[in-house]
Amino acid sequence: YRNFSTKIWNATKFLEYNKCTFNKDYRPKKLKNKINIWIVNEFNSTLKKLYENLNSYKFNEAADNIYKFFWNSYCDWYIELIKPSLSEKSVSEDISEFRNVSSWILFNSLSIINPFMPYVTETLSKEYFGSKELLIVSKWPEPCLIEDNNIAKNEINFLISLLTEIRIIRSELNIPYKQKLELLIRNNESLKLSIITKYKDIICDISKLSSIKIISHEFPNGSATGVVGELSIGIPLSGTINLDDEIIRLKKEINKVEEEILKFEQNLSNKNFINRAPEKVVNELKDKRNASIDKKNKLNEALNRVDFKK
Protein backbone atom coordinates (compact mmCIF):
# COMPACT_ATOMS: atom_id res chain seq x y z
CA TYR A 1 0.00 0.00 0.00
CA ARG A 2 3.02 2.32 -0.06
CA ASN A 3 2.38 3.15 -3.72
CA PHE A 4 -1.28 3.75 -2.91
CA SER A 5 -0.30 6.22 -0.18
CA THR A 6 1.84 8.06 -2.72
CA LYS A 7 -1.10 8.08 -5.13
CA ILE A 8 -3.37 9.66 -2.49
CA TRP A 9 -0.72 12.21 -1.56
CA ASN A 10 -0.02 13.20 -5.17
CA ALA A 11 -3.73 13.57 -5.95
CA THR A 12 -4.10 15.89 -2.96
CA LYS A 13 -1.10 17.98 -3.97
CA PHE A 14 -2.44 18.23 -7.52
CA LEU A 15 -5.74 19.62 -6.26
CA GLU A 16 -3.92 22.01 -3.94
CA TYR A 17 -1.75 23.30 -6.79
CA ASN A 18 -4.80 23.83 -8.98
CA LYS A 19 -6.75 25.69 -6.29
CA CYS A 20 -9.39 23.01 -5.85
CA THR A 21 -10.55 24.28 -2.46
CA PHE A 22 -12.95 22.10 -0.51
CA ASN A 23 -16.33 23.52 0.46
CA LYS A 24 -17.87 21.40 3.21
CA ASP A 25 -21.36 22.61 2.27
CA TYR A 26 -20.98 21.67 -1.39
CA ARG A 27 -23.08 18.83 -2.84
CA PRO A 28 -22.75 17.84 -6.50
CA LYS A 29 -26.47 17.77 -7.26
CA LYS A 30 -26.89 19.80 -10.46
CA LEU A 31 -23.92 19.04 -12.67
CA LYS A 32 -23.45 20.18 -16.24
CA ASN A 33 -20.22 18.50 -17.28
CA LYS A 34 -20.46 14.84 -18.30
CA ILE A 35 -17.02 14.04 -16.83
CA ASN A 36 -18.22 15.19 -13.41
CA ILE A 37 -21.51 13.31 -13.73
CA TRP A 38 -19.53 10.18 -14.61
CA ILE A 39 -17.14 10.35 -11.63
CA VAL A 40 -19.92 11.09 -9.11
CA ASN A 41 -21.91 8.11 -10.37
CA GLU A 42 -18.75 5.98 -10.20
CA PHE A 43 -18.31 7.09 -6.59
CA ASN A 44 -21.96 6.32 -5.81
CA SER A 45 -21.55 2.85 -7.28
CA THR A 46 -18.37 2.31 -5.24
CA LEU A 47 -20.14 3.34 -2.02
CA LYS A 48 -22.95 0.89 -2.70
CA LYS A 49 -20.55 -2.03 -3.25
CA LEU A 50 -18.40 -0.94 -0.31
CA TYR A 51 -21.28 -0.90 2.17
CA GLU A 52 -22.62 -4.22 0.90
CA ASN A 53 -19.22 -5.86 1.43
CA LEU A 54 -18.73 -4.31 4.86
CA ASN A 55 -22.18 -5.46 5.98
CA SER A 56 -21.24 -8.96 4.83
CA TYR A 57 -17.85 -8.73 6.63
CA LYS A 58 -16.02 -9.01 3.31
CA PHE A 59 -13.30 -6.59 4.31
CA ASN A 60 -10.85 -7.57 1.59
CA GLU A 61 -13.46 -6.96 -1.12
CA ALA A 62 -14.38 -3.65 0.52
CA ALA A 63 -10.76 -2.50 0.45
CA ASP A 64 -10.52 -3.59 -3.18
CA ASN A 65 -13.61 -1.51 -4.06
CA ILE A 66 -11.99 1.64 -2.68
CA TYR A 67 -8.58 0.88 -4.17
CA LYS A 68 -9.87 0.36 -7.71
CA PHE A 69 -12.10 3.43 -7.64
CA PHE A 70 -9.48 5.81 -6.29
CA TRP A 71 -6.54 4.52 -8.31
CA ASN A 72 -8.26 3.81 -11.62
CA SER A 73 -11.40 5.92 -11.92
CA TYR A 74 -10.36 8.97 -9.90
CA CYS A 75 -6.59 9.29 -10.34
CA ASP A 76 -5.83 7.56 -13.63
CA TRP A 77 -8.83 8.89 -15.50
CA TYR A 78 -10.83 11.64 -13.83
CA ILE A 79 -7.82 13.74 -12.84
CA GLU A 80 -6.21 13.16 -16.25
CA LEU A 81 -9.40 14.19 -18.03
CA ILE A 82 -9.78 17.44 -16.09
CA LYS A 83 -6.09 18.47 -16.17
CA PRO A 84 -6.38 20.46 -19.41
CA SER A 85 -9.36 22.38 -18.00
CA LEU A 86 -7.50 23.27 -14.80
CA SER A 87 -4.38 24.57 -16.52
CA GLU A 88 -3.52 28.27 -16.39
CA LYS A 89 -4.22 28.60 -20.11
CA SER A 90 -7.67 27.06 -19.83
CA VAL A 91 -10.78 29.09 -20.60
CA SER A 92 -13.13 26.26 -19.64
CA GLU A 93 -16.47 27.45 -18.29
CA ASP A 94 -16.60 24.29 -16.16
CA ILE A 95 -13.47 25.04 -14.12
CA SER A 96 -15.44 25.92 -10.98
CA GLU A 97 -17.46 22.72 -11.21
CA PHE A 98 -14.29 20.67 -11.74
CA ARG A 99 -12.68 22.19 -8.66
CA ASN A 100 -15.73 21.56 -6.48
CA VAL A 101 -16.34 17.99 -7.64
CA SER A 102 -12.67 16.93 -7.53
CA SER A 103 -12.23 18.17 -3.94
CA TRP A 104 -15.60 16.73 -2.85
CA ILE A 105 -14.66 13.30 -4.21
CA LEU A 106 -11.20 13.44 -2.64
CA PHE A 107 -12.44 14.38 0.84
CA ASN A 108 -15.11 11.69 0.84
CA SER A 109 -12.62 9.16 -0.52
CA LEU A 110 -10.32 9.90 2.41
CA SER A 111 -13.24 9.14 4.74
CA ILE A 112 -13.82 5.65 3.36
CA ILE A 113 -10.10 4.90 2.99
CA ASN A 114 -9.47 5.96 6.60
CA PRO A 115 -10.23 2.64 8.39
CA PHE A 116 -7.74 0.88 6.12
CA MET A 117 -5.08 3.63 6.05
CA PRO A 118 -5.67 5.93 9.04
CA TYR A 119 -2.41 7.89 9.25
CA VAL A 120 -2.09 9.32 5.76
CA THR A 121 -5.81 10.08 5.51
CA GLU A 122 -5.99 11.84 8.89
CA THR A 123 -2.88 13.87 8.02
CA LEU A 124 -4.28 15.02 4.68
CA SER A 125 -7.70 15.70 6.16
CA LYS A 126 -6.15 18.03 8.72
CA GLU A 127 -3.45 19.68 6.58
CA TYR A 128 -5.28 20.09 3.28
CA PHE A 129 -8.94 20.21 4.24
CA GLY A 130 -8.44 21.86 7.63
CA SER A 131 -10.67 19.33 9.35
CA LYS A 132 -10.97 19.72 13.11
CA GLU A 133 -12.83 16.46 13.52
CA LEU A 134 -10.98 13.17 13.08
CA LEU A 135 -12.12 11.08 10.13
CA ILE A 136 -12.37 8.01 12.35
CA VAL A 137 -15.29 9.57 14.25
CA SER A 138 -16.84 11.51 11.37
CA LYS A 139 -19.92 10.41 9.47
CA TRP A 140 -19.30 8.34 6.38
CA PRO A 141 -20.50 9.71 3.04
CA GLU A 142 -23.78 8.68 1.48
CA PRO A 143 -24.47 8.40 -2.25
CA CYS A 144 -25.18 11.83 -3.69
CA LEU A 145 -28.38 11.54 -5.68
CA ILE A 146 -27.87 12.97 -9.15
CA GLU A 147 -29.24 12.04 -12.52
CA ASP A 148 -27.97 8.55 -13.39
CA ASN A 149 -26.94 9.71 -16.78
CA ASN A 150 -26.20 6.83 -19.16
CA ILE A 151 -25.22 9.40 -21.76
CA ALA A 152 -22.38 10.54 -19.48
CA LYS A 153 -21.38 6.95 -18.75
CA ASN A 154 -21.32 5.97 -22.43
CA GLU A 155 -19.46 9.13 -23.46
CA ILE A 156 -16.70 8.88 -20.88
CA ASN A 157 -16.28 5.11 -21.18
CA PHE A 158 -15.85 5.52 -24.94
CA LEU A 159 -13.39 8.36 -24.38
CA ILE A 160 -11.37 6.20 -21.97
CA SER A 161 -11.35 3.31 -24.47
CA LEU A 162 -10.05 5.59 -27.22
CA LEU A 163 -7.30 7.08 -25.04
CA THR A 164 -6.32 3.59 -23.85
CA GLU A 165 -5.99 2.31 -27.41
CA ILE A 166 -3.73 5.22 -28.35
CA ARG A 167 -1.60 4.57 -25.24
CA ILE A 168 -1.26 0.91 -26.16
CA ILE A 169 -0.11 1.77 -29.68
CA ARG A 170 2.52 4.17 -28.30
CA SER A 171 3.74 1.60 -25.79
CA GLU A 172 3.85 -1.41 -28.12
CA LEU A 173 5.66 0.47 -30.88
CA ASN A 174 8.07 2.32 -28.59
CA ILE A 175 6.84 5.73 -29.72
CA PRO A 176 8.22 8.44 -27.39
CA TYR A 177 5.50 9.95 -25.21
CA LYS A 178 6.29 13.52 -26.26
CA GLN A 179 6.27 12.66 -29.96
CA LYS A 180 3.28 14.40 -31.55
CA LEU A 181 1.07 12.07 -33.59
CA GLU A 182 -1.76 12.45 -36.06
CA LEU A 183 -4.90 10.43 -35.33
CA LEU A 184 -7.02 9.27 -38.26
CA ILE A 185 -10.58 8.04 -37.73
CA ARG A 186 -12.51 5.99 -40.28
CA ASN A 187 -16.20 5.48 -39.53
CA ASN A 188 -19.62 6.84 -40.37
CA GLU A 189 -21.14 6.55 -36.89
CA SER A 190 -22.14 10.12 -36.12
CA LEU A 191 -22.61 9.56 -32.36
CA LYS A 192 -19.01 8.48 -31.73
CA LEU A 193 -17.68 11.17 -34.05
CA SER A 194 -19.65 13.80 -32.14
CA ILE A 195 -18.06 12.58 -28.88
CA ILE A 196 -14.60 12.88 -30.43
CA THR A 197 -15.41 16.38 -31.67
CA LYS A 198 -16.70 17.37 -28.22
CA TYR A 199 -13.58 16.14 -26.40
CA LYS A 200 -11.08 16.89 -29.17
CA ASP A 201 -8.94 19.25 -27.08
CA ILE A 202 -8.77 16.77 -24.18
CA ILE A 203 -7.88 13.88 -26.50
CA CYS A 204 -5.13 15.88 -28.21
CA ASP A 205 -3.71 17.11 -24.90
CA ILE A 206 -3.64 13.73 -23.12
CA SER A 207 -2.52 11.69 -26.14
CA LYS A 208 -0.07 14.30 -27.46
CA LEU A 209 -1.76 14.54 -30.86
CA SER A 210 -1.06 17.22 -33.44
CA SER A 211 -4.44 16.69 -35.08
CA ILE A 212 -7.49 14.44 -35.42
CA LYS A 213 -8.86 13.83 -38.91
CA ILE A 214 -11.95 11.98 -40.08
CA ILE A 215 -11.31 10.06 -43.32
CA SER A 216 -13.39 7.93 -45.67
CA HIS A 217 -10.49 6.26 -47.49
CA GLU A 218 -7.99 3.59 -46.40
CA PHE A 219 -5.30 4.43 -43.86
CA PRO A 220 -1.93 5.41 -45.39
CA ASN A 221 0.71 2.72 -45.82
CA GLY A 222 2.73 2.18 -42.67
CA SER A 223 -0.01 3.17 -40.22
CA ALA A 224 -0.51 1.63 -36.80
CA THR A 225 -4.16 0.63 -36.62
CA GLY A 226 -6.63 -0.20 -33.89
CA VAL A 227 -10.34 -0.63 -33.19
CA VAL A 228 -12.41 1.18 -30.56
CA GLY A 229 -15.96 -0.10 -30.59
CA GLU A 230 -17.20 0.50 -34.13
CA LEU A 231 -14.42 2.97 -34.90
CA SER A 232 -11.27 2.15 -36.83
CA ILE A 233 -8.33 4.35 -35.89
CA GLY A 234 -4.98 4.81 -37.57
CA ILE A 235 -1.76 6.58 -36.67
CA PRO A 236 0.61 7.28 -39.59
CA LEU A 237 4.11 6.29 -38.52
CA SER A 238 6.13 7.65 -41.43
CA GLY A 239 8.72 10.01 -39.98
CA THR A 240 7.82 8.95 -36.45
CA ILE A 241 9.74 5.69 -36.11
CA ASN A 242 11.87 3.61 -38.48
CA LEU A 243 9.36 0.97 -39.54
CA ASP A 244 11.95 -1.47 -40.89
CA ASP A 245 13.96 -1.32 -37.66
CA GLU A 246 10.80 -1.73 -35.59
CA ILE A 247 9.72 -4.81 -37.57
CA ILE A 248 13.15 -6.37 -37.08
CA ARG A 249 13.08 -5.61 -33.35
CA LEU A 250 9.61 -7.10 -32.88
CA LYS A 251 10.45 -10.25 -34.84
CA LYS A 252 13.63 -10.77 -32.80
CA GLU A 253 11.64 -10.38 -29.58
CA ILE A 254 9.03 -12.86 -30.81
CA ASN A 255 11.70 -15.44 -31.71
CA LYS A 256 13.33 -15.00 -28.31
CA VAL A 257 10.05 -15.48 -26.47
CA GLU A 258 9.15 -18.51 -28.60
CA GLU A 259 12.43 -20.15 -27.54
CA GLU A 260 11.56 -19.47 -23.89
CA ILE A 261 8.10 -20.99 -24.33
CA LEU A 262 9.60 -24.07 -25.99
CA LYS A 263 11.95 -24.65 -23.03
CA PHE A 264 9.10 -24.27 -20.55
CA GLU A 265 6.93 -26.70 -22.55
CA GLN A 266 9.73 -29.26 -22.72
CA ASN A 267 10.12 -29.21 -18.94
CA LEU A 268 6.38 -29.33 -18.32
CA SER A 269 5.95 -32.26 -20.71
CA ASN A 270 8.73 -34.19 -18.94
CA LYS A 271 6.85 -36.62 -16.69
CA ASN A 272 9.99 -37.41 -14.71
CA PHE A 273 10.45 -33.72 -13.89
CA ILE A 274 6.78 -33.21 -13.04
CA ASN A 275 6.71 -36.20 -10.68
CA ARG A 276 9.89 -35.24 -8.82
CA ALA A 277 9.73 -31.45 -8.70
CA PRO A 278 7.93 -29.73 -5.79
CA GLU A 279 4.46 -28.45 -6.67
CA LYS A 280 5.60 -24.89 -6.04
CA VAL A 281 8.36 -25.19 -8.66
CA VAL A 282 5.97 -26.66 -11.23
CA ASN A 283 3.44 -23.89 -10.65
CA GLU A 284 6.13 -21.22 -10.96
CA LEU A 285 7.20 -22.76 -14.26
CA LYS A 286 3.61 -22.72 -15.51
CA ASP A 287 3.28 -19.08 -14.50
CA LYS A 288 6.47 -18.21 -16.40
CA ARG A 289 5.23 -20.07 -19.47
CA ASN A 290 1.87 -18.29 -19.37
CA ALA A 291 3.60 -14.92 -18.93
CA SER A 292 5.78 -15.66 -21.97
CA ILE A 293 2.72 -16.63 -24.01
CA ASP A 294 1.04 -13.35 -23.04
CA LYS A 295 4.18 -11.46 -24.02
CA LYS A 296 4.29 -13.23 -27.38
CA ASN A 297 0.65 -12.36 -28.06
CA LYS A 298 1.29 -8.69 -27.29
CA LEU A 299 4.34 -8.63 -29.54
CA ASN A 300 2.32 -10.18 -32.36
CA GLU A 301 -0.41 -7.60 -31.80
CA ALA A 302 2.20 -4.86 -32.04
CA LEU A 303 3.51 -6.34 -35.29
CA ASN A 304 0.00 -6.65 -36.69
CA ARG A 305 -0.79 -3.05 -35.80
CA VAL A 306 1.47 -1.78 -38.52
CA ASP A 307 -0.26 -1.73 -41.89
CA PHE A 308 2.20 -2.70 -44.62
CA LYS A 309 -0.08 -2.63 -47.63
CA LYS A 310 1.88 -1.82 -50.76
Residue ranges and their predicted role:
Residues 54-61:
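Short helix-adjacent coil turns
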